């Protein structure tokens, strides 16, 4: 997965119709995923875990069965594309899209701020977007008002530098981050602990 730039194509929102194929325009085909097994909080929590080595071990009965059981969206790219595929007021396995992704469409759903497991669509804060001494990276909400600031806090120096170098050249592009957000103690500023490069994507 990593944090290599993901070339998402933003498309107008559509109403969620089971079995429809409009999602293929932004890389998300609803028919390729198991909506009923999707658990948003668990999926985002898994993104904070270190990457596991790929295993070629087959599950019993999978090989030669002629059918492949779809999995729920689980990478940041898949979940973000799914959210962009539908209207923010729609639901996916009973979860409101706008309560999974904060973007320009759903910001009205967050009058008091951003708390808990959420994906945010942000941009590099200007003029300064990081604090090397405190290992923090700052983003602003990629919304018309830009009223929220998001702080990515790092314990690992190497990971901090890696993400800083990803964010630095992409000041004009949306940066998508998944995390467990909490108040920073300052008005309209929210923070999270950044643990894995799977938690961030650049949208181009």
Task: Please describe what each predicted stretch is.
Residues 1-204:
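Intrinsically disordered, low-complexity linker/tail regions enriched in polar/charged residues
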């Amino acid at each position: 997965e990593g944090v290599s730039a993901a070339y998402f194509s933003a498309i107008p929102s559509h109403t969620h119709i089971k079995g429809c194929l409009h999602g293929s325009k932004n890389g998300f085909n609803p028919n390729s995923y198991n909506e009923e097994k999707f658990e948003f909080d668990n999926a985002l929590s898994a993104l904070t875990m270190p990457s596991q080595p790929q295993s070629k071990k087959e599950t019993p009965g999978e090989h030669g069965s002629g059918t492949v059981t779809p999995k729920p969206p689980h990478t940041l790219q898949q979940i973000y594309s799914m959210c962009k595929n539908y209207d923010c007021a729609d639901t996916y396995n009973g979860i409101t899209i706008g309560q999974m992704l904060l973007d320009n469409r759903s910001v009205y759903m967050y009058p008091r701020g951003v708390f808990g497991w959420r994906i945010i669509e942000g941009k590099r804060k200007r003029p300064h977007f990081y604090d090397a001494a405190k290992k923090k990276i700052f983003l602003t909400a990629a919304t018309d008002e830009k009223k929220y600031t998001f702080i990515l806090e790092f314990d690992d120096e190497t990971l901090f530098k890696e993400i800083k170098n990803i964010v630095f050249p992409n000041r004009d592009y949306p940066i998508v981050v998944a995390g467990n957000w909490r108040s920073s103690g300052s008005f309209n500023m929210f923070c999270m602990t950044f643990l894995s490069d799977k938690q961030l994507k650049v949208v181009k």
